[in-house]
């Protein structure tokens, strides 16, 4: 009877030892798991912090910064006006969201006439480019600076004034072709597309460029031609 009792006591002790070992292993497993989780969390936290500190080095270059390095094509006559009044303040664009088309509103005046007008001290208006009656193109303001042509949108747009032979505001063939070429080139350099080409009218409601306001179909044709030219540039 005594031996039987001892047997049960020993078996009970063995069970306790087994349970104790299992509990010990479980505690160790939980401890190791928690420790690993803490290490992983610390690693990613420090990695995120390091990335945050280095982020400026990977910041994408803005369209404005890119334009500072753009070389203007040889078919553009660069005649920058001097800094004065509001015509050219030297203020940089905040962004480039649109290319804005205007018409000069003075029939038969040339690109040179309009550029020289912008350059006068008393003049408070200007545009980045003027497209002339013979298809000539004059640049008046650097691409990355504000011009004074599109009201509140001067801060984030590039403006093009276009000459016309008569009061209808319709551009002749040479002028039109140069306008398409210039607009497509600007879109290609800024990463925009034909849908980003707008009229002065679309900003303020002013009838400018007159012919494209009065003939919506011709405006759409123009954007279509720009799209085709842009596609050719990308080939």
Segments from the language model and where they lie:
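N-terminal catalytic cores of peptidoglycan-degrading enzymes
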Residues: 2-150
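Basic/polar, cationic surfaces and motifs that engage anionic cell-wall
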Residues: 17, 24-26, 32, 39-72, ...
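Solvent-exposed, acidic/flexible segments
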Residues: 94, 122, 153, 168-176
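Hydrophobic faces of well-ordered beta-strands that scaffold small-molecule active sites
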Residues: 101, 158-160, 197-199
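Short coil-to-beta-strand
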Residues: 151-159
């Amino acid at each position: 009877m005594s031996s039987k009792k001892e047997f049960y006591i020993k078996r009970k002790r063995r069970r306790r030892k087994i349970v104790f070992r299992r509990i010990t292993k479980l505690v160790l497993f939980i401890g190791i798991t928690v420790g690993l989780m803490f290490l992983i969390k610390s690693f990613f936290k420090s990695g995120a912090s390091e990335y945050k500190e280095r982020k400026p080095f990977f910041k994408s270059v803005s369209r404005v910064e890119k334009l500072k390095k753009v070389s203007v094509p040889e078919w553009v006559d660069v005649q920058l006006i001097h800094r004065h009044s509001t015509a050219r303040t030297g203020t940089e664009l905040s962004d480039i969201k649109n290319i804005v088309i205007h018409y000069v509103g003075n029939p038969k005046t040339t690109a040179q006439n309009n550029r020289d007008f912008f350059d006068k001290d008393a003049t408070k208006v200007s545009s980045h480019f003027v497209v002339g009656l013979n298809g000539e193109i004059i640049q008046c303001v650097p691409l990355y600076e504000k011009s004074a042509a599109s009201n509140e949108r001067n801060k984030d747009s590039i403006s093009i004034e276009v000459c016309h032979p008569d009061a209808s505001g319709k551009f002749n063939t040479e002028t039109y072709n140069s306008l398409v070429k210039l607009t497509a080139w600007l879109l290609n350099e800024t990463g925009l597309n034909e849908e980003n080409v707008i009229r002065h009218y679309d900003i303020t409601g002013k009838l400018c460029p007159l012919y494209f306001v009065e003939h919506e179909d011709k405006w759409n044709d123009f954007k279509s031609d720009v799209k085709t030219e842009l596609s050719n540039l990308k080939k």
